[in-house]
Amino acid sequence: MAGLKQHSGLVVPLDAANVDTDAIIPKQFLQAITRVGFGKHLFHEWRYLDAEETRLNPDFVLNFPQYQGATILLARKNLGCGSSREHAPWALADYGFKVMIAPSFADIFYNNSLNNHMLPIRLSEEEVEEIFQWVWANEGKQIHIDLEAMTVTVGDKIYRFELDEFRRHCLLNGLDNIGLTLQHEDAIIAYESKIPAFLR
């Protein structure tokens, strides 16, 4: 997969705290075990007026015309709380989100997001509030994420974030668990060549 070094995109301001994984992707859509096809069910209860998903809720922010094509999700604290379903980051990624910004994330959701090549950025509540205000006042304008510098540029202001160096390395280089293993392929082959034949 491609590395995520820098990204510019529109922001959806989801003005809610404690958004749980059941809100992100309800349990009735969890039967599938592939990562594709969940985007259309993202925020199902909030996004649609009917169970068949034929009528969009015009009052839900994801349906606002000015946020169509957004790739960055902005939310309040404790994003991704609730059950530890990996389908939640699958749905967000399948919809098109690449980056999430919030004051805090549920631990399992945070790790699942990184494992699925999405970047969850933690900023202070005050900084997140500033970004909400900027997004509301600057419809249609993009913000810029630089993972190499670990900065978020919003208008003329730069915010700095932290990320574990191992996770940063994986995102920058587009590495999943298999890719990480293959980085050590020569060492693995050398080790296996020393194993007695009867143990192979």
From Swiss-Prot:
* Pfam families xref list: Aconitase_C
**Gene Ontology CC entries for this record:** 3-isopropylmalate dehydratase complex
Query: Which range is the signal sequence, renumbered to this chain?
Result: none
Lyase among the record's keywords?
Answer: yes
Q: Which GO terms describe its molecular function?
A: 3-isopropylmalate dehydratase activity
EC number(s): the record gives 4.2.1.33
Q: Which UniProt keywords apply?
A: Amino-acid biosynthesis, Branched-chain amino acid biosynthesis, Leucine biosynthesis, Lyase
Functional pathway = Amino-acid biosynthesis; L-leucine biosynthesis; L-leucine from 3-methyl-2-oxobutanoate: step 2/4
Catalysed reactions, as listed in the record: (2R,3S)-3-isopropylmalate = (2S)-2-isopropylmalate
GO BP terms: namely: L-leucine biosynthetic process
The answer to whether the entry has keyword Amino-acid biosynthesis is yes
* Function per UniProt: Catalyzes the isomerization between 2-isopropylmalate and 3-isopropylmalate, via the formation of 2-isopropylmaleate.
Listed under subunit, the entry gives: Heterodimer of LeuC and LeuD.
Family statement drawn from the similarity comment of this UniProt entry: Belongs to the LeuD family. LeuD type 1 subfamily.
Q: HAMAP family, alphabetically? A: LeuD_type1
NCBIfam families listed in its UniProt record? leuD, PRK01641.1
Q: What is this protein called?
A: 3-isopropylmalate dehydratase small subunit
**From which source organism is this entry?**
Actinobacillus pleuropneumoniae serotype 7 (strain AP76)
Task: Give the encoding gene's name.
Answer: leuD
